[in-house]
Amino acid sequence: MKTNNHNAKQAQTKTAKSNPSKEVTKIKPKRVKNKPTAKAAKSTGLKTNAANESSDVEVIKTAKSGLHERNAHRGRYDFKKLIAAEPQLKSFVIKNPKGEDSINFSDPKAVKMLNKALLAAHYDIEYWDIPDTYLCPPIPGRADYVHRVAELLDGEVKGKYAHHKVRALDVGVGANCIYPIVGVTQYGWHYTGSDVDPKSIESARTIVERNVSLNGKIELRQQTSESNIYRGIIQPNDRYDITTCNPPFHRSAEEAAMGSQRKLDNLKANQRKKGVKVQAHQAKTPQVKANKPALNFGGQNAELWCEGGEAAFIRKMANESQAFSAQVLWFTTLISKKDNVRPMRKQLEKLGVKAIRIVEMSQGQKVSRFMAWSYMDKAQRKAWIELK
């Protein structure tokens, strides 16, 4: 189910600048109230009956600049360290116009090998692989989402959250299993990963089984119904502190293919502008045919598109979340399209959530965001934490 890779290559190509992550704006909690009827508003200007009582939704918006301070990928990639962790990366390293070590980011094999090296060097992952044509995630940005939701949990307590007790659910874990890997290795979380694609579950399970650090920390569950998200995955006795999701972005396979081609063209144009030879690495490793852009960016149907696209997916996610309101402290999802934020917020307010967080994350020119919501008010969230 993972997608949002329409900006993935840009995020992978550029690591964060070395300046510290900082909060750009912070809006104080906003109490969202149901409007009084037109008649009442006209006659008194005030709410006059129980039907018009406040929905009392606490909405906080924040904007974060740069990668999180706990993100291991701030600054440029240390290729000496990466090659030491994964020697096979060496054959893919080239020089950029500034004479600095880099790779050809239009070569999927080079990007995949870079990911292996990053996971080995920073997360002690001894084995990581994904099937051909599956989504190869830009790890710095993916890791930042996990660090930001961890920060959300930390905001619930004085000091730090008891992360070693956290139970997390990743909707659409994908073949790469990236969010559980980061959550387990960086915070000691216990993760459940779900996916509709059997091959993704098989790949993720192999990654877990072949890494001692992940054994017993990640459970994979097959979603047997393409029409469900949480249903069939969250069991009656489950309790999750946090959920994560990178929802399908496109509305059709054709739209996904066009998006992949557009990203490939933009990437090559950007490389040429910088003086990088797009085919510079051909002599060292076979290049994917130009008429198969999906291989350069990766992604299967369930990862890239669904009927109605991102808007329809997160709308269904919101609706389903209501049935599990007492079993999850904070639901979260990435939202790629800014235009989808307001409708999602309005829908959540109608569903009766008590708190909403909208966190915008920017790294260079790339801007992403996630939305978090809870059906518990502050006192109820405190009680949840005290029972852990």
Curated annotation (Swiss-Prot):
Report keywords, A-Z. Cytoplasm, Methyltransferase, rRNA processing, S-adenosyl-L-methionine, Transferase
* Subcellular localization(s) per the UniProt record: Cytoplasm
Cellular component aspect of the GO annotation: cytoplasm
Source species, domain of life: Bacteria
Q: Where is the composition biased (Polar residues)?
A: 1-22
Q: Tell me the InterPro entries matching this sequence.
A: METTL16/RlmF (IPR010286), rRNA_lsu_MeTfrase_F (IPR016909), SAM-dependent_MTases_sf (IPR029063)
GO BP, one example?
Answer: rRNA base methylation
One Gene Ontology MF term: 23S rRNA (adenine(1618)-N(6))-methyltransferase activity
Q: Which reaction is this enzyme known to catalyze? A: adenosine(1618) in 23S rRNA + S-adenosyl-L-methionine = N(6)-methyladenosine(1618) in 23S rRNA + S-adenosyl-L-homocysteine + H(+)
Does the record bear Methyltransferase in its keywords?
Answer: yes
Q: Where is the composition biased (Basic residues)?
A: 27-36
* Record region (Disordered): 1-51
- One Pfam family, short name please? Methyltransf_10
- Entry similarity comment: Belongs to the methyltransferase superfamily. METTL16/RlmF family.
Q: What does this protein do?
A: Specifically methylates the adenine in position 1618 of 23S rRNA.
Q: What is this protein called?
A: Ribosomal RNA large subunit methyltransferase F
> Organism, per UniProt?
Vibrio campbellii (strain ATCC BAA-1116)
